[in-house]
Each structure stands twice: as C-alpha cells, then as structure tokens.
C-alpha cells in the first residue's frame, strides 16, 4: 500500500491577523487563495483553518458572481502573473 504524502504544518495567517470579516471587493487579498488558473486552493496548501477557508470560498464565489474574478482560465490563456491586470 502506498504511503500517504506528508505536508508541512502551516498556520492560518487570517487567525494570526485576527480577521473576522473579508470583503469580496478586495481582489488583492484573494490572490493568496487562488491558483494561477483562478481555482480555490485547498486548506492543506494554504494552511487556513476551516472557518477561514469557508469564508474565503464564499468570498471568492461572490467575487466571481460580481465578475471581479474569472471562473476559470483555459489552457491557452494561462498567464504567469494572473493578478497584474486586476490592480
């Protein structure tokens, strides 16, 4: 049986900063939780706690509905710095 991959323990940066509310219009803060294809990154990679991961998912979904962040990017249009044009 294959062994499970071990990940380094990460700590929630939102808990350390004592964040209680996140705004969907703050696209710059969302970039740490999105991949280069604008997918929501999992908790094991970002180190977020469950509470903040759920909050981030809700905020990203609201930003997508408001057309501030694209839903997905096709393979041909992936860019190396996806948030350069969102500033």
Swiss-Prot record:
Q: Name one GO biological process term.
A: translation
- Asked whether the keyword Ribosomal protein is assigned, the reply is yes
Query: Which of UniProt's keywords are assigned here?
Result: Ribonucleoprotein, Ribosomal protein, RNA-binding, rRNA-binding
Its gene name is rpsR
Q: Which HAMAP family match?
A: Ribosomal_bS18
Assembly description: Part of the 30S ribosomal subunit. Forms a tight heterodimer with protein bS6.
Family, per the entry?
Belongs to the bacterial ribosomal protein bS18 family.
Check the record and name the InterPro entries matching this protein. Answer: Ribosomal_bS18, Ribosomal_bS18_sf
The intrachain disulfides are none
Signal peptide (from-to): none
One GO location term (cellular component)? cytosolic small ribosomal subunit
Q: Name one Pfam family in it.
A: Ribosomal_S18
Tell me the superkingdom of the source: Bacteria
* Coiled coil (UniProt feature): none
Entry protein name: Small ribosomal subunit protein bS18
Keyword Acyltransferase applies: no
């Amino acid at each position: 049986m294959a062994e499970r991959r071990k990940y380094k323990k990460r700590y929630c940066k939102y808990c350390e900063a004592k964040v209680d509310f996140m705004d969907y219009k703050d696209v710059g803060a969302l970039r740490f939780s999105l991949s280069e294809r604008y997918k929501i990154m999992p908790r094991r990679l970002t180190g977020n706690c469950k509470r903040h991961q759920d909050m981030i998912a809700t905020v990203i979904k609201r930003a997508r509905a408001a057309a501030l962040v694209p839903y997905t990017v096709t393979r041909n249009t992936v860019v190396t710095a996806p948030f350069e044009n969102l500033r």
